[in-house]
Amino acid sequence: MKKILFMDTTLRDGEQSPGVNLNEQEKLQIARQLERLGIHVMEAGFAAASEGDFQSVKRIANTIQNATVMSLARAKESDIRRAYEAVKGAVSPRLHVFLATSDIHMKYKLCMSKEDVLDSIYRSVTLGKSLFPTVQFSAEDATRTARDFLAEAVEVAIRAGANVINIPDTVGYTNPEEYYSLFKYLQESVPSYEKAIFSCHCHDDLGMAVANSLAAVEGGALQVEGTINGIGERAGNAALEEVAVALHIRKDFYKAEPSMTLKEIKATSTLVSRLTGMVVPKNKAIVGANAFAHESGIHQDGVLKEVTTYEIIEPALVGESQNLFVLGKHSGRHAFTEKMKELGYEFTNDERDAVFEAFKKLADRKKEITEEDLRALMLGEAAFAAQQYNITQLQVHFVSNSTQCATVVLKDEEGNVFEDAATGSGSIEAIYNAIQRILGLECELADYRIQSITQGQDALAHVHVELKEGAHQVSGFGVAQDVLEASARAYVHAAGKLKSFIQLVK
């Protein structure tokens, strides 16, 4: 039975989702979780895009030990050399070079002839191979490329040294039958086919990204590309968790097994959702809140008698636990540390002390702590530690005529303290007005969302905000048991990002 490898592009293609703006620390958190998920290759970013992207890719490359780290690059020498500088420190570095091959792209975007495109492919892959042990070539807009020219371009790339050939459905145009036949055509028409691994990369514009990816596996693809939760620009990418579980459940049909640690799927999905602010729909396959819920009386009766009557996936398979209580206020440092190790978190002594202190404060107010609480706590403390500004004091009181007044005290990374007060028609507006006055911003609140981490009146709150000033839009989140504190943390998180970004572009 063939093993299917997964290339995750959440940190590159996924971050192109409107409103998603991850900082370096957040990208590293996702990369570490992708490593725990057993992802074979992670596309850490586009190193040549900006200095920020370069530094993020480099840090991930120098951190990840058990996965290949890859950077995207155009078929340009400067991009390829920049990618090399970013990932050369990785245990397993890879270059991902791409060039469009469809008539519409060659004519209107590239302004290149077919001969020019073939020459550029050969030169860029040859250069890449002189620097990297593994080179992946993508024929952008492959599904709208003339098949004979696509086969010619692929052959040139393999002869130049490409180890992996990606056949992307860049605009989500194809369907399963066409995509399957395209892979079969290349298998028959590319003389050097056996010298490379073929990969699929599907977008969801017509809602067929997962189905097309599975069709590609049937057609011979050994690598599937996509993102966690299917995030990405426009309608998104193929959701890797859906492809992986489909292959596992229907291995009798696909004769393939996913190379992924399936029990880490739920934790990975939750982390990506909270850091990006992109809510997972309740009815989403595999990771949605209703994925294992049964409302119909007939269905409930059947499941109670025999679970397989209506449930083809065991919740535990993807790490969907019953959220059992795991720790309490009497739990010590050793028990806490061991539980966090079990969940995949490793700390320095300073980090452990800070997170344990936050845990004890939560345990004093919350009767029982669940795994979801611990993950949220870790997420919130990591974001809090990486912020440019932190909240040291927050006070809200009623003034008159439904007006609230908020006093906020912030401390920056150098230890400088800033204090201001403001009013608003509600507590949250007053808090946000005070923070704006301190940071000197004139931004607009583009989005505000709140969700409960777990059930119960003492549950942790997770608040997501999006701020917009001119053409700049960023997101931030905050986690706390108190809604106002979580809201303030989220605003400071986003506002710090916005202030830094505005200063950078100036």
From Swiss-Prot:
So, what pathway does this thing act in? Amino-acid biosynthesis; L-leucine biosynthesis; L-leucine from 3-methyl-2-oxobutanoate: step 1/4
Q: What family does this chain come from, according to its entry? A: Belongs to the alpha-IPM synthase/homocitrate synthase family. LeuA type 1 subfamily.
Highest taxon of the lineage: Bacteria
Quaternary context: Homodimer.
What EC number(s) has UniProt assigned to this enzyme?
2.3.3.13
User: Where are the residues of the annotated region Regulatory domain?
Assistant: 390-506
Q: Does the keyword Transferase apply?
A: yes
Question: Gene symbol?
Answer: leuA
Annotated GO biological processes are:
L-leucine biosynthetic process
Q: Keywords for this entry? A: Amino-acid biosynthesis, Branched-chain amino acid biosynthesis, Cytoplasm, Leucine biosynthesis, Manganese, Metal-binding, Transferase
List positions binding Mn(2+).
D13, H201, H203, N237
Give the molecular function GO annotations: 2-isopropylmalate synthase activity; acetyl-CoA C-acetyltransferase activity; manganese ion binding
SMART domains named in the record: LeuA_dimer (SM00917)
Name recorded for this polypeptide? 2-isopropylmalate synthase
Role of this protein? Catalyzes the condensation of the acetyl group of acetyl-CoA with 3-methyl-2-oxobutanoate (2-ketoisovalerate) to form 3-carboxy-3-hydroxy-4-methylpentanoate (2-isopropylmalate).
Q: Which Pfam families match?
A: HCS_D2, HMGL-like, LeuA_dimer
> Which stretches make up the Pyruvate carboxyltransferase domain?
4-266
